[in-house]
C-alpha cells in the first residue's frame, strides 16, 4: 500500500489515480491474492478480531467516522510501544500514514482484524 502514498482520495476509487479507504485495502490485499468485501463495514466481519496490544503490521484497523457503524479502514504499517501507525485514504488528504494516538482516530477506534496468517 505504501507505493500509493500521496494518491488522492476518490470515492469508489481503486487505483493510484484515487482511492477511497476500502478501495486502497482491497487493492493492496488483492496483490496478496486475498479477496475482501468492498466496504469497510463488511470487511470488519472478515478474519479474527485482535486485541490492540497484539496488533501487527498488515492487520486491518477500523473506525466509526460517520454515525454508529464502521465506516473507515486502514492497514497497520507499524506497531510501537504506545502507538499504532496505519496507512489509509482520508477524504481530506488522500493516502497517508496516521497514528491511532491522533485525537480524531483515538476517539473513533473500533477494532483490529487479522486476515493474514
Residue ranges of predicted features:
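Short, Lys/Arg- and Gly-enriched loop/turn segments at beta-strand edges
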Residues: 68-75
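Aromatic- and glycine-rich peptidoglycan recognition patches
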Residues: 48-50, 76-117
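Catalytic cysteine-centered active-site loop
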Residues: 7-57
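Extracytoplasmic/secreted envelope proteins and their assembly/folding machinery
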Residues: 2, 22-26, 55, 71, ...
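Intrinsically disordered, low-complexity
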Residues: 1-7, 115-117
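Structural motif
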Residues: 58-59, 75
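Substrate-binding/catalytic groove segments of enzymes
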Residues: 34-38, 69, 81-85
Amino acid at each position: 500500500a505504501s507505493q500509493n502514498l500521496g494518491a488522492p482520495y476518490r470515492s469508489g476509487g481503486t487505483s493510484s489515480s484515487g482511492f477511497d479507504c476500502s478501495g486502497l485495502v482491497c487493492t493492496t490485499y488483492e496483490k496478496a491474492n486475498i479477496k475482501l468485501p468492498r466496504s469497510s463495514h463488511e470487511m470488519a466481519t472478515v478474519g479474527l478480531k485482535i486485541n490492540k496490544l497484539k496488533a501487527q503490521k498488515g492487520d486491518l484497523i477500523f473506525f466509526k467516522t460517520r454515525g454508529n457503524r464502521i465506516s473507515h479502514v486502514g492497514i497497520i504499517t507499524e506497531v510501537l510501544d504506545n502507538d499504532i501507525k496505519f496507512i489509509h485514504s482520508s477524504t481530506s488528504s488522500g493516502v497517508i500514514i496516521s497514528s491511532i494516538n491522533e485525537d480524531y482516530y483515538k476517539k473513533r477506534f473500533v477494532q483490529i482484524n487479522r486476515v493474514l496468517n
